[in-house]
């Protein structure tokens, strides 16, 4: 039965990769499913020879078991960490950047913007910080794309603060902090900031926000597109551990 599961998973992972590639043109990090899928299929083909190398096979099982335990625990934290606090009022709403398709918000960015709009339209006194610089293949900054989208959907431009220098989540928080403190003329630790990002990204954002001096934060997260969930949450596993170890 276990052998059948290994083969089935290998086939499913491989099909999933090609599904994303054909239907959506591929998404970042989806290649891992192709690699793992092929490895599982190859293992199924050569499993008898692999099992003959008893020491190697035993060590391999231990390594895989440890990795799976860490993976499951980490994913559980990512999945179940609180993601929405609409009731909590904040003076500033910070939207974390995502990729731009030339000048148009990507699916992920649009999800964050639509989520932000829900909050902004019922909280007239809240300012919004759009955070994100210009990435590879992007004709305008992520901040500009977000600002244009918000204005198009009825948000007064005077409520919008642009942060257009950041290139990653750590810098989103670092540079937005300067913008918020400059605008409010107050220390960030004295302000309530609500952060808008995507569901898989909340836990890591909380860690990075805290490291950058955001003491009073809450979240209002958009939902990931169902087709992208396996890739997004797998990618976030590695990104979270990178943040825990390196992003200071």
Spans of model-derived segments:
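A transmembrane-helix-recognition feature enriched in membrane-embedded lipid enzymes
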Residues: 229-248
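Internal/C-terminal transmembrane anchor helices
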Residues: 55-77
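A structural signal for short, hydrophobic/glycine-enriched beta-strand patches
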Residues: 73-234
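Membrane-interface helix-boundary motifs at transmembrane edges
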Residues: 24, 46-59
């Amino acid at each position: 039965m276990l052998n059948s599961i290994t083969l089935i998973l290998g086939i499913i992972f491989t099909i999933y990769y090609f599904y994303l590639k054909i239907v959506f043109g591929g998404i970042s990090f989806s290649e891992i499913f192709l690699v793992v899928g092929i490895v599982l299929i190859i293992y199924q083909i050569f499993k008898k020879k692999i099992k003959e190398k008893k020491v190697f096979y035993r060590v391999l099982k231990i390594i895989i078991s440890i990795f799976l335990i860490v993976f499951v625990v980490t994913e559980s934290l990512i999945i179940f960490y609180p993601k929405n606090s609409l009731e909590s009022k904040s003076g500033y709403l910070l939207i974390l950047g995502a990729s731009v398709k030339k000048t148009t918000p990507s699916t992920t960015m649009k999800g964050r913007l639509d989520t932000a709009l829900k909050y902004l339209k019922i909280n007239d006194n809240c300012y919004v910080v759009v955070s994100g610089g210009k990435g590879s293949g992007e004709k305008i900054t992520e901040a500009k794309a977000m600002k244009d989208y918000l204005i198009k959907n009825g948000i007064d431009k005077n409520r919008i603060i642009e942060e257009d220098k950041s290139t990653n989540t750590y810098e989103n928080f670092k540079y937005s902090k300067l913008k918020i403190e400059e605008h409010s003329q107050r220390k960030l630790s004295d302000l309530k900031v609500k952060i808008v990002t995507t569901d898989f990204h909340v836990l890591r954002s909380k860690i990075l926000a805290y490291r950058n001096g955001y003491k009073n934060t809450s979240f209002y997260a958009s939902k990931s597109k169902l087709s992208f969930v396996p890739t997004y949450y797998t990618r976030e596993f590695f990104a979270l551990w990178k943040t825990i170890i390196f992003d200071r």
